[in-house]
């Protein structure tokens, strides 16, 4: 249990996908103008990462990994060259299901997210989470915790940035820094804040 708690804390704070690895910056910067919209996208990312990482873990370890098809009578089979294609397909399917669910049950959030909801499919934060799971050889339980933790970390980062950007509307920002300029500085400062967790050993 302690291992899972440590993994979750590490995924949220120490190895934050947005602020440590700078993954998913396109949607991170574009949808962080309002806290409500940022929170909605953050929840969507948590759901997609929380499902896609463990599902891809099962597919990789039971079908794609070298020797994984021993149960089917093919002990020498190695389908790992298909992993990227498979991972993207699974992520796309999950995002499509989420998109249909939001359109039906939360149309206001669906309309607010607009084009950025289907863009979660190609959001490198989602693919990065899945790739890290394979690289670090997580088991199924660890992949569930890592997927949810990575999603929570990304959501926390985008909501924090959205809160700062909402306050910046009332700030006297120099003309040359308005828009993305002050946003990049804000992201850097939030990232520096999260760097303080890098000294934590778990």
UniProtKB/Swiss-Prot annotation:
It is found in: Cell inner membrane. Belongs to the NqrDE/RnfAE family. GO terms for biological process: respiratory electron transport chain; sodium ion transport. One of its GO terms (cellular component) is plasma membrane. The chain crosses the membrane at residues 11-31, 39-59, 81-101, 114-134, 144-164, 180-200. It is a multi-pass membrane protein. Its EC number is 7.2.1.1. The keyword Acyltransferase does not apply. NQR complex catalyzes the reduction of ubiquinone-1 to ubiquinol by two successive reactions, coupled with the transport of Na(+) ions from the cytoplasm to the periplasm. NqrA to NqrE are probably involved in the second step, the conversion of ubisemiquinone to ubiquinol. Pfam families: Rnf-Nqr. Keywords: Cell inner membrane, Cell membrane, Ion transport, Membrane, NAD, Sodium, Sodium transport, Translocase, Transmembrane, Transmembrane helix, Transport, Ubiquinone. One of its GO terms (molecular function) is oxidoreductase activity, acting on NAD(P)H, quinone or similar compound as acceptor. It catalyses: a ubiquinone + n Na(+)(in) + NADH + H(+) = a ubiquinol + n Na(+)(out) + NAD(+). Composed of six subunits; NqrA, NqrB, NqrC, NqrD, NqrE and NqrF. It comes from Idiomarina loihiensis (strain ATCC BAA-735 / DSM 15497 / L2-TR). The keyword Membrane applies. It is an enzyme of class 7 (translocase). This is Na(+)-translocating NADH-quinone reductase subunit E.
């Amino acid at each position: 249990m302690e291992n899972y708690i440590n993994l979750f804390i590490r995924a949220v704070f120490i190895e934050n996908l947005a602020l440590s690895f700078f993954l998913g910056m396109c949607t991170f910067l574009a949808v962080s103008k309002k806290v409500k919209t940022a929170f909605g996208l953050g929840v969507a990312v948590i759901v997609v990462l929380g499902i896609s990482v463990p599902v891809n873990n099962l597919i990789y370890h039971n079908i794609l990994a070298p020797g994984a098809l021993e149960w089917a009578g093919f002990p020498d089979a190695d389908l790992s060259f298909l992993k990227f294609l498979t991972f993207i397909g699974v992520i796309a399917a999950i995002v499509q299901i989420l998109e249909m669910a939001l359109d039906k049950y939360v149309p206001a959030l669906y309309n607010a997210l607009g084009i950025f909801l289907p863009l979660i499919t190609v959001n490198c934060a989602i693919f990065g989470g899945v790739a890290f799971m394979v690289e670090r050889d997580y088991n199924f339980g660890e992949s569930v915790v890592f997927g949810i933790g990575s999603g929570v970390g990304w959501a926390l980062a985008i909501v924090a940035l959205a809160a700062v950007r909402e306050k910046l509307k009332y700030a006297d920002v120099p003309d040359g820094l308005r828009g993305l300029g002050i946003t990049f500085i804000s992201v850097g400062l939030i990232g520096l804040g999260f760097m303080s967790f890098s000294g934590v050993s778990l």
